[in-house]
């Protein structure tokens, strides 16, 4: 017998029982995005490798260790996208969407990173991202955060996420801070682990979010990034904080929050949770005013975020068990007896015409009434429509409320109206 071929480690199948809750969560997210006037953009999952090297930064874990990169048959270096912002910016430049324009965009889909698979972190994972172009004030930063806060309320998880904020200033301010931080780290080099020693000269700000407890203790005495901010960045951050306070959104300023990608400036933020074991990031983003120009476009202010859907689904399931998937089926059509199947299928098509949006499944494969009602229960149907030989002969159907057990014989022409009343 041939050996079974299994999924690649860290790249998961999502089965019907799981995709149902994903669909409900994604529907909730998309409804909120629509209420803010954001438009979907669909992007390739494969891009030219230099796009990510230029956008993310060559001296980052993503580029150095995690990207899935390969040569195609033409010898071009291609990469499965590890994140969505770079591709969105590339598309905006390529199609003339950005210069002297405002765009509020969102995208959803799989991303790929070669990481050690663990709960909520996989090699193929799914993100929903938002990107706004052409607006440079703190008000749009605040709107994005307010949008995410509305998501948490709609999903019933507001009490389980907290907002952390920081400003990492301008490029010049970060360069000055980088020099001060490197000088401090050099004085305490013996207390750094090997990873931090490597980052100290290549990407020293990444030392700030080291997970090593000893390094975190050392950083208590390090220079503070906030002390090196330029005045414009200070005013921008103060404006953002004031807007969030006016909106009733609580936050904590975390001066060690820097984000893992090189393109950020000024505002950075993360929504974090402790409800999945160790602290985990649910949603993160910030401002990246230099990235469009860095990738070949005209200078354009920009801000955005990305959210990992696997982790969000886990969080919703962990803290809000009342948030359940919608049933697969609203109505199950039961048919038993000689020559009833064609009549049942014809009635089903008529009901689908008259009740758009209602999910109706017709029984196939035969079976007595008991077996068919068991199938209706399995699929979560609220109502059964029953056709037997006598109903076909009389032009009627029996409509049964599967919750109360009440059933009524109804003329087939009136079945849709009766169902509309039952289903609300």
From Swiss-Prot:
Its EC number is 6.1.1.21. The keyword Phosphoprotein does not apply. One of its GO terms (molecular function) is histidine-tRNA ligase activity. Keywords: Aminoacyl-tRNA synthetase, ATP-binding, Cytoplasm, Ligase, Nucleotide-binding, Protein biosynthesis. It is an enzyme of class 6 (ligase). It catalyses: tRNA(His) + L-histidine + ATP = L-histidyl-tRNA(His) + AMP + diphosphate + H(+). GO terms for biological process: histidyl-tRNA aminoacylation. It is found in: Cytoplasm. InterPro entries: aa-tRNA-synth_II (IPR006195), aa-tRNA-synth_II/BPL/LPL (IPR045864), Anticodon-bd (IPR004154), Anticodon-bd_dom_sf (IPR036621), His-tRNA-ligase (IPR015807), HisRS-like_core (IPR041715), HisRS/HisZ (IPR004516), HisRS_anticodon (IPR033656). GO terms for cellular component: cytoplasm. It comes from the Bacteria. Homodimer. Belongs to the class-II aminoacyl-tRNA synthetase family. This is Histidine--tRNA ligase.
